[in-house]
Swiss-Prot record:
SUPFAM superfamilies: Pentein. The active site is at residue 392. It is found in: Cytoplasm. This is Arginine deiminase. The keyword Cytoplasm applies. It catalyses: L-arginine + H2O = L-citrulline + NH4(+). Pathway: Amino-acid degradation; L-arginine degradation via ADI pathway; carbamoyl phosphate from L-arginine: step 1/2. It comes from Mycobacterium avium (strain 104). The gene is arcA. Belongs to the arginine deiminase family. It comes from the Bacteria. The lineage of its organism: Bacteria, Bacillati, Actinomycetota, Actinomycetes, Mycobacteriales. It is an enzyme of class 3 (hydrolase). The keyword Hydrolase applies. Its EC number is 3.5.3.6.
Length: 402
C-alpha cells in the first residue's frame, strides 16, 4: 500500500486515516465534585469505555481505515523532539496559578520524565500528592495551602473527542481555540503533534491566528469548497467569520455557511443535530429541520458578501445541487429528543452511504437503513457520558477526494 495523501475535502469521501484517543487515566480523574466542571454528565465505567472504544477502533480497521492513536502520536513526538517536550511542559504548567517557585520545580521535573510518562501526565494531569517527594515545600505558599488531591495539572477527560481539537480542510490542518477552560489545553497537544511528529512533517496550517473560538464539531465539509460552521455554545460568530476569511485567503473554500444553533448542552455543536451520510444527504434532528438558518459568506471581487437563507436552501445552492436530501427519522417527539441527546445524529461516514452510529439509537438507525444507508453500530453506554458520538470521537486525517 502506498503512502496516503493527507487531507479531506468532504464528510463522506472514503475514510483512509483517522486520529482517535483511547480513553485512559484522564477519565479516572472524574469524581462527583468535578464532573460538571470537566463537562461530563456522569462518571463513566472506564474499563467498559475502553472496551467500547476498542470495538470502535477495530471496526474502522476492519474497513481498511488506518487508526492513529493520539497517545501514541504524542509519545512519539515527545521522543522525537526536545522542542516538543519543552512545548508540552510549557503549555501544562501555569505559573499564574502555581506561582513561580513551584512552576519552575514542576517544569524541571516534567522535562526529565520518559516520553511515555510525560505523555501520560500531559493527558491525565497530576495532583499535588503526586509531586515528587523532594519537591521543596518551604519555598511555595501554593504548595503548602493546596489540598493534596487538587490538580497541579488539570486532566483532559474530553480528549476522547478528537474531532474538536484539530480540523483537516483540504491539505491543511486547523488547530483551533477551544471555548471552555476544561478543554483549552487539548489543542496544545494536537499543536505539538502536528509540529513535531515525523508523520506530519511539512503539513501546513490554516486559521493560524486562532484568535476566536472554533471547535471541530461545529465544522462540516458539505462539499469540496463548501464549509458549514455551527455558531452556538462553543464556536462564536467571530470565530466563524475569522475561519471563513482564513479559508478564503488560502483558497480552501469558496463558501462558508455560518449556522446559528441553540446554546444548550444537548446541541453544543452542529454535528449533534446534523451530519452528512451521503454526498447529498444528511441526517438531522427533526426538531431543527425547519428552524435552521444560515448566513452564506462568500468572497467577491469587492470583498466579502453575507446573505441569509434557510440552511437547507443555502447548503444546496452552495453545493450546486437542486436539493439537500434530509432523512426523515419520523420519530415521536419524545423519542427524537432522547435519541438526539444520545448522539443519534452524530454519525461518522466511512464512505458515501456507509456510517458508524451508536447502537442504542435504534429508531434513528432503522430509519437510516430504510433510506438506504448502511449503518455499522457500536456500543456507547459509557463513551456517551461525555455527550459525543462516533463523529465526535474521530478526526479524519485523510479521505479520498470527491
Amino acid at each position: 500500500m502506498g503512502v496516503v495523501e493527507l487531507g479531506t475535502n468532504s464528510e463522506v469521501g472514503a475514510l483512509r486515516v483517522v486520529i482517535l484517543h483511547r480513553p485512559g487515566g484522564e477519565l479516572l480523574r472524574l469524581n462527583p465534585r468535578n464532573v460538571d466542571q470537566l463537562l461530563f454528565d456522569g462518571l463513566p465505567w472506564v474499563a467498559r469505555a475502553q472496551e467500547e472504544h476498542d470495538q470502535f477502533a477495530e471496526l474502522l480497521r476492519s474497513r481498511g481505515v488506518e487508526v492513529l492513536l493520539l497517545s501514541d502520536l504524542l509519545t512519539e513526538a515527545l521522543t522525537h523532539s526536545g522542542a516538543a517536550r519543552m512545548q508540552g511542559v510549557a503549555a501544562a504548567v501555569d505559573a499564574r496559578r502555581l506561582g513561580v517557585p513551584l512552576a519552575q520545580e514542576l517544569s524541571a521535573y516534567l522535562r526529565g520524565l520518559e516520553p511515555a510518562r510525560l505523555a501520560q501526565v500531559l493527558m491525565a494531569g497530576m495532583t499535588f500528592n503526586e509531586l515528587p517527594a523532594d519537591t521543596r515545600t518551604d519555598v511555595s505558599l501554593v504548595l503548602r495551602m493546596h489540598h493534596g488531591g487538587d490538580f497541579v495539572i488539570d486532566p483532559l477527560p474530553n480528549l476522547v473527542f478528537t474531532r474538536d481539537s484539530s480540523i483537516w480542510i483540504g491539505p491543511r490542518v486547523v488547530i483551533p481555540t477551544l471555548a471552555l477552560r476544561a478543554r483549552v489545553r487539548e489543542a496544545s497537544l494536537t499543536d505539538l503533534i502536528y509540529a513535531h511528529h515525523p508523520r506530519f512533517t511539512g503539513v501546513r496550517r490554516a486559521y493560524e491566528s486562532r484568535t476566536a473560538p472554533v471547535e471541530g464539531g461545529d465544522v462540516l465539509l458539505l462539499a469540496p469548497g463548501v464549509v458549514a460552521v455551527g455558531v452556538g455554545e462553543r464556536t462564536t460568530p467571530a470565530g466563524a467569520e475569522a475561519l471563513a476569511r482564513s479559508l478564503f485567503d488560502d483558497d480552501l473554500a469558496h463558501t462558508v455557511l455560518a449556522v446559528p444553533i441553540a446554546q444548550r448542552r444537548a446541541q453544543m455543536h452542529l454535528d449533534t443535530v446534523c451530519t452528512m451520510v451521503d454526498t447529498d444527504t444528511v441526517v438531522m434532528y427533526a426538531n431543527v429541520v425547519d428552524a435552521l438558518s444560515a448566513f452564506t459568506i462568500q468572497r467577491t471581487p469587492s470583498g466579502v458578501e453575507i446573505s441569509e437563507a434557510p440552511f437547507l436552501e443555502a447548503a444546496a445552492t452552495a453545493m450546486g445541487i437542486d436539493k439537500l436530501r434530509v432523512i426523515d427519522t419520523g420519530l415521536d417527539p419524545v423519542i427524537a429528543e432522547r435519541e438526539q441527546w444520545d448522539d443519534g445524529n452524530n454519525t461518522l461516514a466511512l464512505s458515501p452511504g456507509v456510517v458508524v452510529a451508536y447502537e442504542r439509537n435504534a429508531q434513528t438507525n432503522m430509519r437510516l437503513q430504510e433510506a438506504g444507508i448502511e449503518v455499522l453500530t457500536i456500543a456507547g453506554s459509557e463513551l456517551g457520558t461525555g455527550r459525543g458520538g462516533p463523529r465526535c470521537m474521530s478526526c479524519p486525517v485523510a479521505r479520498d477526494p470527491l
